[in-house]
A protein has these predicted regions:
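A short hydrophobic beta-strand segment most commonly corresponding to one strand
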Residues: 21-47, 176-188
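C-terminal amphipathic alpha-helical segment
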Residues: 36-131
Length: 188
């Protein structure tokens, strides 16, 4: 196990056994119909067996050998795992006043994640070559025509303004993002 450093990303290939960090992290990934939770106790709570077997085909239900065959043991136990898969933040050159961008997940052909910081009072235009999901993790302002805000206390069923999907065409045109705070950065 490796300590998680805030702001640092990891690339975890499919089949590599791993666990969530003890701090809030984001794990960008592509769609998959496989999810096997092999941890039987989490923070003192016993996980039900169905979390282990739900994604097994009917003919393999309860087959422990089939469960363990899902794991890529060679990648999961490689001695240079950290060196190969850690993703230190890569700051991008400043292109607009009040905008700081850095890659936090990269170096694979399927997914990437960028942290975008808009300074207090700044208005910037974000352009990209592909569609993306934007998550507001700190601050408030405008994301295109919408109000955006990192949630403080969010209860089940509440509406929030922290998640946006940007189509490829909109990403290429650019989205205007404004931080309406006088004090706090807007971090997406």
């Amino acid at each position: 196990a490796y300590g998680v450093q805030p702001g640092t990303g990891w690339y975890t290939p499919a089949g590599v056994i791993h666990a969530p960090a003890s701090v809030v992290t984001y794990e960008p990934q592509w769609n998959s119909d496989v999810n096997t939770i092999m941890e039987n106790v989490t923070m003192g709570e016993v996980n039900p067996e169905n979390l282990l077997t739900d994604c097994q085909p009917k003919e393999e239900k309860g087959d422990v050998d089939a469960l363990f065959a899902q794991i890529d043991w060679e990648e999961s136990t490689r001695k240079d795992y950290k060196q190969k898969y850690i993703r230190a933040p890569k700051p991008l050159p400043e292109t607009q006043k009040g905008l700081a961008e850095k890659w936090v997940a990269y170096a694979n052909e399927w997914i990437a994640a960028k942290e975008v910081t808009v300074a207090p009072g700044a208005k910037v235009k974000l352009s990209d070559q592909a569609c993306y999901c934007a998550l507001v993790v700190q601050g408030h302002g405008k994301f295109g025509t919408f109000e955006c805000e990192a949630p403080g206390v969010l209860r089940y069923g509440d509406i929030s303004g922290d998640e946006f999907f940007v189509s490829e065409s909109a990403a290429k045109k650019g989205i205007v993002v404004e931080n309406t705070s006088s004090y706090e950065p807007l971090i997406i």
